[in-house]
Structures are given as structure tokens and as C-alpha cells.
Amino acid sequence: MPGVTITTAVRTGPTSATVRESSQAFFIGLAQRGPVDEAVLVRSLAEFEETFGTYVTYAYLHPTVQTFFEEGGTQCYIARVVGPGATTANVILDDGGPSADELIELTANGPGNWAHSMQIQVTASGSLRNIKLTYNGDLVYQTGNRASASALVSAINNSAIASQYMTATLLIDELPGASAAVAFGAGTYTDGNDDIGDSTVDTTFTAYVSALDLFLDSYGTGAVVCPETHQINTQLIAHANSYNRIALLHLEEGTSDPADDAATLSAEDHSEHAAVYYPWVFIPTDVNGVNKLIPPTGFVAGKRALAHNQTGPHQPYAGLVSSARFVNGVEVDVNRTLGDSLDAEYVNAIRFIANSIRIYGARSLSTDTDNFRFITIQDTVNGVVIEANASMEDLV
């Protein structure tokens, strides 16, 4: 039709424009790059990739965040985890003279060998200097011609683009010499390494638990998730209780007894703050016909966000509202009999029902079924507590 252009594309952002604070998620995990000393708020997969990079084979964080947004999520905080021996790559710019006086230190935005793909070049135009940054061979930032080292440093540190890749520290306020492109971590510069292993996740238990501290109380309520491991489920529950949040939990891939695994978690203190979901789910990949198996918590967090934004924290994120838009398979086919038995053991099944994949349960892990049978009860209480605390701030 003349004058009409139709464009198709894969969704990479939230599917709802409404954002209730209670709908947000807090994700801990491994990433290609990014800071490790703060939690970063992102509102789309594109924003996530700008700071934390693209998919890496050893991590579940990227596909979990992707699933969250595809299934209705609107915003989440990300806490990146690295190993205990992680190092951050750098480059030092000198005056180009015989003494090689060090003038500016450029440090990658977070540990890891991803920084080896960054190169820095200094160009000269008379008495002015310009610092160019390339990543994977593409020019991503340049300072423009500046008259002093302090001006170069200021330009880098005040740039939203440059800060995704590096920070600058002024050592001596003298102009650096012109130089050919040099890679971060090359030669005598500090190498970058995230210390998480080549093909298996060997990041320490302590690193995951410590990352929970990055989710500050001031960020409000929401759901906390760690897709990389089920081994910190107890700590996720404790965090959720302390910060008026919900812990969305998964079990080990291929577990033969999900009910028994959930029973152990039900015995934990404050289990009314947690819900467990089974089985793992499949999502599509960039390769046509190839799917990837991931923990179900990104899917659940997305449907929780959708329910909160459409209705409120009292709305169960199960049944019709949880019909999958992106998830396309389940690890185990849960029939009605198995689903009912799992529900009796505080496990929320994800099932193929009415030609769609849906969450088939809204149980919390609490054995106090008179007061906390459903996870939405604690979700509602959390919202009331947060609003009450906010209202009383002016009276304190």
C-alpha cells in the first residue's frame, strides 16, 4: 500500500509501558563485561547489552534477562559476579618522550578479558589531542580535540558512552604523545580476567552471596533471582525477608525429585518470601531450530512483572496471564497428576496447557498455609510495608 512501511523485528524491550516498582526484578549472574561494584538498572535487553555485553556460553544471565523482557518485564537491576582472582585491564598513556612519563590511566569498566578487544589511539592536531576508543574493531568513542590532559579525562568520565567501556584517571596534567593503537592489557599493562573458568562456572559461593549486598534497600521491593546456581537459595530467601522482596527459586537441572528438594527449602526460616518453579524451560536462539535450556526464573519474573503492571501485586502470575510469548518448551512434561502432587509439595509446575506453556501454581514455600499459602500474599504485604515506610519518611 503506498505510503505504508511495515518493519518486522525481534522484540528486545518490555512489552508493557506501565512500571510498578513491585514488578521489578533483581538478577545476579555472570556476564561478558560490566561493573562488579554496583547494581545497574536496565529497562531493555539492549540496555543490558550496552553495559554487560552479549551472550556468553558459560552464563545464564543474558538469556534470563532476555526472557524476562520478552515475557513482560519492564525493568531490572543487574549485579555482575566474577571469580576471586578477577583482574581489570588497563592502558597508560605517556608523554611519548624518552622518559615515558605516565599521564593518564584508562581502566576497563569491569574485570575480564573482554577488554582485550578494546584499543586506544591518541592523535595530535597541533597542540591538541584526541583519544579514540575502538571495540572489536569499531570506533565507539572519541574525546574530540582537547587542549589538556585534564580535559581529556573529564570528557571520558562525563560521557555516557565512554563510561560503558572505561574510566580515566589523571596522573600528570600534561598532554600525552600521539600513539598508534594499543590494546587494553597488552604488554606491561594489567591483564583482564574474570576468573570464572573456560567452560564451567567455578565462581565461588561467596561471590554470589556478596553480590546480594549490591541490591540496596532504597531500590524498593521486587523479585530476586540467581539463574547461575541453585546453591544460594537459602541466602536468596534471607535477602528477600530482610529487604521486603520475593525470592524466585529454581532447582538443579534434571533433578529427579523436585518435591524433596523443595521440602528442604520449605524448612528454611521466612520461606513465605520464596516460591520455587519446575522444570527448566527452552527458549529460541539466534540459530534457527536450535533452542537453549535455561532456569525458569526469568520466565516467571517476566510474568510476575506483567501481572503486577496490569493489575497489582495481589494478582497471581499463573494461568492465562502466564501464557508464554517467548519460551517454547519445557525440560520435563508435567502432566496433571504430577502437577497436583508438586503443588501439594510447594512446587509450582510449568506446564503445556491449552496449546501454550503456562505457570500452573502460585504457592509459596511456607508451610503456614493458613496465612501464606500463596506467594502473592507476601508480595502484597511487601508492597504495603514499602508504601508505609515511604509515607512515614516525612514524619521521621
Q: What are these model-derived regions, one by one?
A:
Residues M1-V396:
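A glycine- and small-residue-enriched flexible loop/hinge signal that marks low-structured segments
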